[in-house]
């Protein structure tokens, strides 16, 4: 039995959904352990493209158990809509388990999210407005509503009445916004509870039993390392921990259960929202990459900022997460350039920096130190074998391995499952 974690190594949007879908064929259980519907995972199967926000991407293989862990914050309405979306596409042969310890996004969380972002003005962090941060704030303040409360009407009513009273004071007195009617909120969430009750269980008990049965377990992170609350580019971060350590806390799984960590690396860099971005491309090359890579947010539709690959970031992510493997994605997007660059260090006030700084003030002053490599101006999207890759593409991959000391074990060069090659064994692949 083996368990693998798929982790984003950059600012999210690395292609974790595709990698999870590919590895899920050998897994009986797929687990999301943090975040909420601020995540957006895209999976292409044949000519069909599926977009998910809450349910793990491995669901498309059928006969899998998908777990939403305690570290998640769940919008019940969004989850029910996603289940309907899957049903309408004929995806029904799966089991769903929702941790009774996962927290519930309430309607006031979304309004507070928007109000707080507006108040920040030019210092906004680029939130998705889904209520993720305020829900995690209530969790940390020990006043949140959990999924387990949905199956206890009395507990749900008491918690919602108290919370709505307090949130209305905040909304009206601080933001000048309209409040909520507690009874309407209670009735709305009772309807959600009726649909979700069968799935709400103690997920950690299930995971222990699955582990003891010898099931293959795959953990799917949302967002990426640089959006991690503790290790990301704070304050431009999410409110949870997408890194490897977050999987144990956010799923209720012991560390010894984890065998391998796959760091998903986009062949170039992207970022949504504000914050420093040393290798950013703001000219024609950046526009070319954005259009060819379809770099627009799955959840927000916002255009992503684009830059060259940054191995200062990759080595930071490697250290934080303990990567055993790299899954390199969107390699085909770089196929039209004569020269490709990799950022290998930063210059800060004349000093060379090789380690990723915690200070956003320092990072904003860092200039990239680039290595240039020859590009390959040929289509690689239809290759069937590793040997068919152009030598320049192989050299690019080899240089990433040299700079990070991690093998590139998976190479993806298009959105479809067939456009993926395994170079080194991960689990049973």
Curated annotation (Swiss-Prot):
Substrate binds at residues 298-304. Binds 1 Mg(2+) ion per subunit. Gene3D superfamilies: Adenylosuccinate Synthetase, subunit A, domain 1 (3.40.440.10), Adenylosuccinate Synthetase, subunit A, domain 2 (1.10.300.10), Adenylosuccinate Synthetase, subunit A, domain 3 (3.90.170.10). It catalyses: IMP + L-aspartate + GTP = N(6)-(1,2-dicarboxyethyl)-AMP + GDP + phosphate + 2 H(+). GO terms for molecular function: adenylosuccinate synthase activity; GTP binding; magnesium ion binding. Its EC number is 6.3.4.4. InterPro entries: Adenylosuccin_syn_GTP-bd, Adenylosuccin_syn_Lys_AS, Adenylosuccinate_synth_dom1, Adenylosuccinate_synth_dom2, Adenylosuccinate_synth_dom3, Adenylosuccinate_synthetase, P-loop_NTPase. GO terms for biological process: 'de novo' AMP biosynthetic process; IMP metabolic process. It is found in: Cytoplasm. Its cofactor is Mg(2+). IMP binds at residues 13-16, 38-41, 128, 142, 223, 238, 302. Homodimer. Plays an important role in the de novo pathway of purine nucleotide biosynthesis. Catalyzes the first committed step in the biosynthesis of AMP from IMP. Belongs to the adenylosuccinate synthetase family. HAMAP family: Adenylosucc_synth. This is Adenylosuccinate synthetase. The lineage of its organism: Bacteria, Bacillati, Bacillota, Clostridia, Natranaerobiales. The gene is purA.
